[in-house]
Amino acid sequence: MNILMVYPMYPDTFWSFKHALKFVSKKASFPPLGLLTVAAMLPKDWNKKLIDMNANQLIDDDILWADLVFISAMSIQSESANDVIMRCNNLNAKIVAGGPLFTSSSEYYQNVDYLVLNEAEITLPIFLKDLQEGIPKHKYTSDDWANITTTPLPLWDLVSLNNYTSMNLQYSRGCPFDCDFCDITVLYGRKPRTKTKEQVIAELDELYFTGWRGPVFFVDDNFIGNKVKLKREILPAITKWMHKRKNPFYLNTEASINLADDDMLMDQMAKAGFEAVFIGIESPNEKSLIECNKPQNANRDLIASIKKIQKFGLEVQGGFIVGFDNDHPEIFEEITNFIQQSGIVTAMVGLLNAPKGTTLEKRLQLEGRMLKDFTGNNTDFTINFIPKMDSEKLLDGYKNILKTIYSPKFFYERVMRFMKDFEPKKKKVFHLNPNYILALFRSIFKLGLIGEERIYYWKLFFWTLFRKPQLFSLAILFAIYGFHFKKISNGFC
């Protein structure tokens, strides 16, 4: 059996880092971890080929070679996924589809032969059994949550690691919180399910033996969902492994703001090699936080919490949202000031949208305010419901935030604020990579010589070189990120 696995293309967004990737001669940020894991669940004697369309071109010969074409995608990849499905239909190729896009919107995919939905650990074996017996059904679903202690190691040999800036790894699924706009609990539940420490170490080993050295992103919905197990088992095991392997990876992940309440946890994460954590800040407006059921963010000094996490050597990357019912006309300036004061360099600001199945979508349906399905991209200047604030004022205010925070003056001011306060707790092991040396020279030319940010670039360049040389590579990385953010925001604004 010949199996073609296809990962559709991402559009050009803030999260794609397309304009930053060119500096390091990479094609995509992360490999398709879900498909690589699904590949490991298929029979070993099947021939498998994987095409990540963010890194390689999908040609008709690939489709014609396959007995089955497996497609996995998130909502933001829907346009590319639809194109792939149409091509497969035209070539009479049988399609197996799964992942968040198809799970949340299966009613739109009658042109897919087999929909294997929800978590693959549960539904895929049933499909494979039916396929072997010659009685496959169109749709496989489950209301159960998978036991991820049985999840196999990803088949990394199906992709070229050189195409990517970072590898990824999953330790847990689910989140204990229930923000009304978030579909994570719809897809994966509120009780965090975790892998064993043996699984985590085996996955780190697997990546290590591929020869990979550099960033590894833990893609968990909320890495600190189960703090007790993390502190007792997982982080000590990772710390020991990293020391034994001479710190080959730089780790980062996503977590909730209550990380700031646990000094031991922050200290352990820093010692284990974690360097950055993405946190959903959402809004400095207390009423908006209560509205979206984000109690962990309410009733606290958010900037103080961010600064505390950073003092433990963890860079905070932040997500922000505008468009809540309780947002007032001053919210745009308040978010801009908050981002600047906090020193959050990577600040992702999006418009509120209501994904399918969320509490927010259900409320808006009852209120008659839903307009269409969410595209999966909350930074594309579209909103899928009728907001309380005038739509034109909302979009204008949103554009003003982006034009301000991603302008060279404000962006580099924020970088300098962060760099002055930040002290990594763990010495970084330097891994010589010709692409990153090339990125330095490309940044000098594109940002330091011909870019509108050149004055700010050189100020950051020399300040870091002489004051904090240990952060020099991070400073250049931030400058490259700033270029990408500016390009995207200019394209929309």
Predicted segments, located by residue:
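Conserved beta-strand positions
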Residues: 5, 71, 218-220, 279, ...
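Radical SAM enzyme core and accessory elements
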Residues: 2-5, 12, 47-50, 62, ...
